[in-house]
Amino acid sequence: MFQIRNYATKYAQSRALRKYPVGGVFHGYEVKRLLPVPELKLTAVDLLHNQTGSQHLHIDRDDNNNVFSIGFKTNPPDSTGVPHILEHTTLCGSHKYPVRDPFFKMLNRSLANFMNAMTGHDYTFYPFATTNETDFANLRDVYLDATLNPLLNQQDFLQEGWRLEHTKVDDPNSDIGFKGVVYNEMKGQVSNANYYFWIKFQESYYPSLNNSGGDPTKMTDLQYEDLISFHRNNYHPSNAKTFTYGNFDLNNTLQRLNKEYQGYGRRGSKKRELLPIQMKEDVSVETEGQVDPMLPPDKQIKTSVTWICGKPEDTYQTFLLKILGNLLLDGHSSPFYQKLIESGLAYDFSVNTGVESQTAANFITIGVQGCDEVDSIYEVINKVWEEVLQNPFEESRIQAIIQQLELSKKDQRADFGLQLLYSVLPGWVNKTDPFDSLLFDETLERFQEDWATKGDNLFKDLIKEFVISKPVFKFTMKGSETFSQKLDAEEQERLERKLKLLDEEDKKVIFERGKQLQELQDLKEDLSCLPSLQISAIPRVSKTYPLLEKDNVLNRITDTNGITYVRGKRLLNHHIPRELYPFLPLYADSLTNLGTSTEEFSTIEEQIKLHTGGVSTRVSVNPDAQTGKPMLLFQVDGWALNSKTDHIFKFWKKLLCETDFHKHKEKLKVLIRSLASSNTASVAETGHAFARNFGAAHLSVTKAINESLNGIEQLQLINKLSQCLDDEALFEKEVVSKLVELQSYINGSSDMKFMITSDSQVQIDAVHQQITGFLSSLPKDSKPCDFYSENYSMLENPGKPTLLQFPFQVHYTAKCYPGVSYTHPDGAKLQILSNMLTHKYLHREIREKGGAYGGGATYSALDGTFSFYSYRDPHALNSLSTFDSVPEFILNKSSWGEPDLNEAKLSVFQQVDSPMSAKNEGTILFHYDVTDEMKQRRREQLLDVNLNDIHQVAEEYLKQDKSIASIVGPEIPNFDALVQTV
């Protein structure tokens, strides 16, 4: 088996070498270099377009999940967000595809498993991934025309960037305010305290980068002419870097690129190198930011210290810096973690902590959040550097890092091509040779040789060169109670300055322009110019991953590259008392953070890294696929080389049975502080998911349990627990005793099931024996309990929308309706309906008109919840009104036809048929009890949905008296009175 696979890999590489000889010219592209990388089973081909100087990197690999990207070096000239707004507006129509928003319209005319456009620090790129060759050609053409020949209409700039517009577009007497998709997106970003700290740090330390995403306080200075100029100066083939990955014929792409580049000449690069501030002495900057409501009032400081450390172009030195960063910061045995976090000086590391190599300079930052003053932090940081120079790193820690690097190389991912693109592009646009980034084995071998001869001096030399006695940059942000009010006041003052400059004619123009934009948004377009796959591209028969079951163990034999993955689960439905449910996530987290009566977790963690790819514990709740009843599961996972799987079970046994909650109370406090410090930021990033989960908890027992485990309720619990850390008696009673009690309920071999994924029957049989030994080491039965998960209470329906307040600048909304189980025939109809509503109605109403960054409908096939949502939304109540209008729109105003239905099916199957890594094959049966027969039946149901079905389920399920609405975000004045009208 291995010999055949290795031969196939070598054959593919030799074929690539023959196909693209160095010096060969293909459609205007000259092959400059080739690089076989056998350890990653790929061959890299470096090509140059002779006419324009455009560079192309092709990764030839036997993988049918093919990737294309076109990217540009886009140094932001200021902080108005012009690279980001241009990224949006290029996708709003082009010369070959002159329709509004071809990007979003291609989302449901394709089977791509990934489509996006992204703005980095100093580059912008447009990637997609698909397994269908026709689809690949379609999307490549749309992307190329969008980037090189966009229409860049002023209306699209106003919609996507920013504009002045009446709050009620059809009322000239209503207030005028700022609107715009990117404007509200970045207001939402600023609401994330971690992002705000990071971007203000960047602006202070690396001001030449500016803010490519856009600072809302500066974005309203951007003019349409600036956008046109930025595109003209940057979106040129000479400044383009294109990338392909996979097994599709490269010649087709080169031919298409060469055709697109005709008429362009070669431009010299005028891009200046962007570097951090040059320091001859220490620099300190202090500013203010958000107060985190989940942290104590006296722990509202974030601070960091930064050193510049050479350039990413030196890829080996950059590799060493990352190893050093890992040794210093990663895990329980790292010195900075022990001295800054474990000591209680701070709650957690700050978001900018670590080695940064994404720009033209490397730098290392040590920072914390959740502290009460900075001097002691700086003192400890300096002391740790001194101690590191005096005390050698343990050999076992180095070997653990090498082991993790080796395993990460062997661990196969379905999105390997995209991950490769993300890893090479930031350096590639900043003069780092992408081939150097691919030399995995060569770099690792050099490191092992250097470590063997130089030992600790390898890292001490780096520290002496870049850190000791070198100028440092200190950045501090203190939480201010008035911060949000100041942001609101700044926006209002900026708006008033704009309004004062308007005369009556200007106001008339604004009013007419707003109406014209809305008319344009409502216009039904002819989309026949856009390419589309046909429904026939979707196979009617689902791909299956054969599994064999023996003794409560599911077995999957597949190509795992010499790795074995083991999963275990125990059904807890009748094992856990109701009052302990909220403590289950903390219990699971504690097992991989505390330690035992005889070992510190730092020692255990090091052994885990030495012998496995990792072990984890978690709790989840899933609905039964047929009945919808909750399945509360405690899960353990682990993976290792085939020869080391016995270690997985040793660690499981140690964590499950020997974790000592009493002895490691202080570590438990550290864990709770860390969880509390990240809670608000997680809501700022995914507030719509929290709103949706909270709403669904009123409709389903499964979702009510999930709200307790993963929702706002869980955040509130962690916040409450973080406030009792200084009261030993209370902490013992409210936290430690409950976790000890959970241990007695969870540990038991009854109701345990497993899944093994490996590459041979011999290995499967060996792991079966290890499972038998593991089960015999556990108590047969855990402590009895008479509470059943089915009896868990749903949240009580409040009868009106609920506002969950957080100190953000925008809102996140959700409206939820009960659906059906996975096997119910109406589930497929509801899933297609949700997709049609997103693309044919809500995208226009919520995003284009309303200015929210995102919005739509979604139907969860597994948990049976239908929901509407909006994301980073400036008009939450308007969005709820739009959700309420959906039934009337479907029944009276929609004019959907078969093409609309087919597009929705294509969009749904993008995820249904998305590529899967070997380790995840068949796991839907293990995690959700969804059989191949159920999957096939649902597939047929999805393909067979008709327009009558859509109207039937809309009328039956989208009833107001069954819905629950929720909003996450800042206070809404007169909320109770206003929601009566929603």
Curated annotation (Swiss-Prot):
* Protein location: Mitochondrion intermembrane space; Mitochondrion matrix
Can you tell me which residues form the catalytic site?
E87, E160
GO MF annotations for this entry?
metalloendopeptidase activity; zinc ion binding
Q: What EC number is given for this enzyme?
A: 3.4.24.-
What are the alphabetically sorted keywords of the record?
Hydrolase, Metal-binding, Metalloprotease, Mitochondrion, Protease, Transit peptide, Zinc
Cofactor(s) needed = Zn(2+)
Cellular component, GO annotation? mitochondrial intermembrane space; mitochondrial matrix
Q: Does the keyword Ribonucleoprotein apply?
A: no
Q: What is its main location?
A: mitochondrion
Span of the transit peptide along the chain: 1-7
In Gene Ontology terms, what is a biological process of this protein? Answer: protein processing
Spans traversing the lipid bilayer? none
Keyword Hydrolase appears in the UniProt entry: yes
Annotated function? Degrades mitochondrial transit peptides after their cleavage in the intermembrane space or in the matrix, and presequence peptides; clearance of these peptides is required to keep the presequence processing machinery running. Preferentially cleaves the N-terminal side of paired basic amino acid residues. Also degrades other unstructured peptides. May function as an ATP-dependent peptidase as opposed to a metalloendopeptidase.
Task: Give the UniProt family note.
Answer: Belongs to the peptidase M16 family. PreP subfamily.
Oligomer status and interactors: Monomer and homodimer; homodimerization is induced by binding of the substrate.
The protein in question is named Presequence protease, mitochondrial
Origin organism is: Kluyveromyces lactis (strain ATCC 8585 / CBS 2359 / DSM 70799 / NBRC 1267 / NRRL Y-1140 / WM37) (Yeast)
Q: Identify the gene encoding this protein.
A: CYM1
